[in-house]
Amino acid sequence: IFCTICTIQAKDRVIERPPFLAWSSNSIEIDKIVMSDTVTTVYIKAFYRPKYWIKIATGSFLKDNNGMLYPIRKGVGITLDKEFWMPESGEAEFQLLFPPIPENVTSLDFSEGDFDGAYKIWGIQLDKDTFYKQKLPKEAVVHKINKKAILPTPKLAFGTATLKGKI
């Protein structure tokens, strides 16, 4: 009798620089998402003023296109609910760990919760082919557009202006 034992290791699904529909802040962006059968790892790049801090809340979660919620498990390179001080460069990287996401999920929303200043990223695409079929969520629209509003007539005038920035 001949027995063959086969073990099949599931291959991780990797989404590099996933497109998204909208975000509440450009201080954090998703560099990569790695989905395995045990954990979903979201690789974050942070951009903020040097020597100032950012924070990721313990109430953070992912919400899939089917409405299922996946609460954050922990941070790697960042401690949840603690001030993360930005280095002199103003750029940093860390990971956020979540429960595994089913393979049939095509998009995710990231949210820290519903409070002032919460980081939110809507419509993170796991399948780039469906990106242009997505609609912007209602909570992502902050300003209503008045299509009947008339813009003022442009005019040249003397005055004082201040321009701040980096070159």
Where are these regions (language model features)?
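A short, amphipathic beta-strand motif
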Residues: 163-167
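Low-complexity, acidic Ser/Thr/Pro/Gly-rich terminal tails and inter-domain linkers that flank the onset
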Residues: 12-37, 66-78
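Bacterial Sec-dependent N-terminal signal peptides
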Residues: 1-14
